[in-house]
Amino acid sequence: MNLNKNLPTGTRDKLFREARAAYKIEQQVNHYFEKRGFKRIETPVIEFEDVFSSEHQADAKLYRFFDEKGRLTVLRPDMTLPIGRVVSTTGVMLPLKLSYSGKIFRANEDFGGEQNEQTQAGIEIIGYPSIKAEIECILIGIGVLNALEIPNFQIELGHAAIYRRVTNLLNLSETAEIDFRLLIQNKSLTGIKRFVADNPSTLDDFILALPRLFGPATAILKQAKNLTTDKGILTALREMETIVEAVSYTADISVDLGLVQDFHYYTGIIFRGYADLAADNFLSGGRYDHLLEQFTSASSPAVGLALNLDSLTTLQNRAGVIKKQVSTSLLIHYDLDAIQQAEKLMQETPNSELSFFETPTNAISFAKKWHIPAVIHVSRQGIQTIFQREADL
């Protein structure tokens, strides 16, 4: 089968207006990070599989292939672990505020509608144990969405320690933990009831309520505190309250106490961003204080934020905030011995471009096809208008 006209599953081309919008968004987001004092970092698209082979990435769907020496390599499925590798192996001084943007690749199932190639931008705050690091990530996420004019968005908070505390207390097998995770993610009331009946504990009331513990932050957190006396869970709830109090002046904040991230490396506050015009989250992040341990014996506190720039481009398009690309208003056809005059004229005339055609006739045909309103001919004898759209006469 000849596939020279096909694209791999989950990939797509971007043309003209969309490609320009995606480029502009990436520029705008990176500029925002820089203004907040973040230092840019770039890592290779190709990494050795060992970077992603820890338990933290057990669910990652990797594009694997062998290099010229027979070593197993992958296309990076996220940016966080490669940045952890850099920080752990280069001896850079902590604490650090890093930013990035680039492509990530995940081998999703066919017909799932997910893009296997995504453009992602984000930040990593490494070496700061303070909750101010989480607050900074969330404020930056909100600031970026406002700068991009994303309408009606909402930030949702969770806490990885809640799910971890429940599963640790229940002492679940690996299979049982996977089943429980799916029940929580699907908010299955019936399934959770059966699970609690089969796995009774001091957290029964809290677990039974988990599928319903999402919504307005203040009300849900107050309700949750009345359902348990467990110190670990109460500590997590108080951290969430602190975050809500700090950032709620900037955006609509909700909570989901059953929020479980796909990557297992999160240890504390986790967050996502949603909007009325988007089916899935386009912003995610949280705290992961043990991530660097797989590269070095020393651990370091870290918080990260990631933005799906492809989703944000789509959101901007749906919201009608993508500005139209400025159209060419003048095509400059020239004789080769008049290139200097033509180039000078093009530099001085906004929204103009040079014609590469050999004849004025071809230049005029091109202008009509692409709705360019005027064509001039530059020669040693001077400048002559050879085409003017009737509406502009």
From Swiss-Prot:
The UniProt record lists the keyword Amino-acid biosynthesis: yes
Subcellular localization(s) per the UniProt record: Cytoplasm
Gene Ontology CC terms, in alphabetical order: cytoplasm
Keywords of this entry: Amino-acid biosynthesis, Cytoplasm, Histidine biosynthesis
Gene Ontology biological process: histidyl-tRNA aminoacylation; L-histidine biosynthetic process
Molecular function as annotated in GO: catalytic activity, acting on a protein; histidine-tRNA ligase activity; transferase activity
Pathway assigned to this chain's UniProt record: Amino-acid biosynthesis; L-histidine biosynthesis; L-histidine from 5-phospho-alpha-D-ribose 1-diphosphate: step 1/9
Source organism, top-level taxon: Bacteria
Matches recorded under Pfam families: tRNA-synt_His
Function according to Swiss-Prot or TrEMBL: Required for the first step of histidine biosynthesis. May allow the feedback regulation of ATP phosphoribosyltransferase activity by histidine.
Family: Belongs to the class-II aminoacyl-tRNA synthetase family. HisZ subfamily.
Other noteworthy facts: This function is generally fulfilled by the C-terminal part of HisG, which is missing in some bacteria such as this one.
HAMAP family: HisZ
Assembly: Heteromultimer composed of HisG and HisZ subunits.
Stated name of the protein: ATP phosphoribosyltransferase regulatory subunit
Species, as recorded: Listeria monocytogenes serovar 1/2a (strain ATCC BAA-679 / EGD-e)
Underlying gene: hisZ
